């Protein structure tokens, strides 16, 4: 049984640094690369990173890397790997994905077939099974992925199962919701802290508000879901339970939060409430049905985060233009508030009425979007305290 694994956390383009910080916060050294964060760890690291990483897509084991310019090199390279340390007799091991980029080998179905054949042959040899008899595959599943970039093959096993953005709290979603891991990453990129008010004026199914409450309460995002590794015989149930129990103990149940989510659609507000209930944070968020232009607040030093409907999500261009203009008018008086708006509309700034202080390119799935960042005026600590005392 292996003691240490080469691991990667896959991540949407533009969010790698966020995941790198999360991995380091768990105590693992890492290297941040395009679309991935590399680190080493034991079985506990596999469990912890799946349970705790908010902004990653998946955690994968790198079984091996080798040059592969021909199918023979691919076969021999896959065959040479230590599959017996991962796959017990009876395991299901589909080659679930093959991706070839800038490589001599480019026929992905053939890459999958050759890789499968090599793993089968290795396991037949290790478990002393006759070559002519197919291996039974009726046990736990180990999804194998093959990536060939510039004639170098990387062979991986997915430990997560469904993508990590699936937290297990979403009862229903809106038309084109933001993914939970993207929302968590944007909150970490923003200047919001749990002691600041937070408003999402176009909250949809409530993702930003729910993820914010979970961050503030230090709730592990994977506590309410299961993972592929939980079925594997070399990951002990006792260790899984220990890590889950430890995570439950770390939840901050004392903190008081000021989070509000609004949406013009009453049905979405009800969905958001149900999602917050399922996530265990319904007491932390005030959801209400409201139009953007009706938003008013006397509070200071807050953060507005919005993923408003945009071109690809809403066919009504005139409606989008009007909404962005209203946002600009409503947000303008909130001088001490920072605003973060995620949209794919490249004309957003002109419709909103002011240039962003900073713009960050991200991908919501395959859709290129920009995070427009408007920073609020700095507030002295005593002013925030005064305002708090006035509220009490």
Where are these regions (language model features)?
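C-terminal catalytic and target-recognition region of SAM-dependent MTase-like enzymes
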Residues: 290-392
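SAM-dependent Rossmann-like transferase core, predominantly class I methyltransferases
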Residues: 155-189
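Non-catalytic nucleic-acid substrate-recognition regions in nucleic-acid-modifying enzymes
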Residues: 2-142, 391-392
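Conserved S-adenosyl-L-methionine
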Residues: 178-296, 312-313, 317-319
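C-terminal edge-of-domain segments
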Residues: 144-160, 372
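A short, flexible beta-alpha/helix-coil linker loop
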Residues: 100-103, 162-163, 309-313
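Flexible, glycine-/basic-rich loop-and-beta segments that form/coincide
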Residues: 48, 53, 162-167, 171, ...
């Amino acid at each position: 049984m292996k003691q240490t694994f080469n691991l990667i956390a896959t991540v949407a383009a533009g969010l790698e640094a966020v995941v790198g910080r999360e991995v380091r916060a768990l105590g693992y050294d890492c290297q941040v690369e395009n679309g991935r964060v590399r680190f080493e760890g034991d079985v506990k690291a596999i469990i912890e990173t799946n349970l705790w990483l908010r902004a990653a897509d998946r955690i994968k084991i790198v079984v091996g890397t080798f040059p592969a310019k021909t199918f023979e090199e691919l076969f021999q390279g896959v065959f040479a790997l230590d599959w017996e340390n991962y796959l017990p007799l009876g395991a299901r091991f589909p080659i679930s994905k093959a991706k070839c980029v800038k490589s001599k080998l480019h026929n992905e179905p053939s890459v999958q077939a050759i890789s499968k054949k090599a793993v089968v042959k290795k396991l037949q040899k290790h478990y002393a099974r006759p070559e002519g008899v197919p291996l039974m595959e009726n046990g736990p599943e180990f999804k194998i992925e093959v990536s060939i970039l510039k004639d170098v093959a990387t062979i991986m096993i997915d430990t997560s199962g469904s993508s990590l953005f699936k937290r297990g709290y979403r009862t229903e979603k809106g038309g084109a919701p933001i993914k939970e891991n993207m929302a968590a990453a944007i909150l970490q990129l923003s200047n919001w802290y749990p002691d600041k008010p937070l408003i999402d004026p176009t909250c949809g199914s409530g993702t930003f508000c729910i993820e914010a409450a979970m961050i503030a309460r230090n709730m592990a995002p994977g506590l309410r879901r299961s993972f592929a590794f939980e079925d594997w015989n070399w990951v002990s149930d006792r260790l899984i339970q220990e890590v889950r129990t430890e995570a439950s103990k770390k939840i901050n149940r004392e903190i008081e939060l000021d989070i509000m989510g609004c949406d013009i659609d009453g049905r979405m507000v009800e969905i958001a409430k149900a999602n917050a209930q399922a996530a265990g944070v319904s007491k932390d968020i005030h959801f209400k049905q409201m139009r953007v232009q009706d938003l008013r607040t006397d509070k200071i030093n807050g953060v507005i985060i919005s993923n408003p409907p945009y071109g690809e999500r809403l066919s009504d261009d005139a409606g989008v233009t009007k909404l962005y203009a209203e946002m600009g008018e409503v947000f303008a008086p909130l001088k001490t508030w920072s605003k973060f708006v995620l949209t794919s509309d490249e004309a957003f700034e002109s419709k909103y009425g002011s240039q962003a202080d900073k713009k960050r390119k991200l991908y919501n799935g395959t859709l290129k979007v920009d995070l427009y960042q408007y920073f609020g005026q700095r507030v002295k600590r005593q002013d925030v305290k005064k305002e708090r005392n006035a509220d009490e």
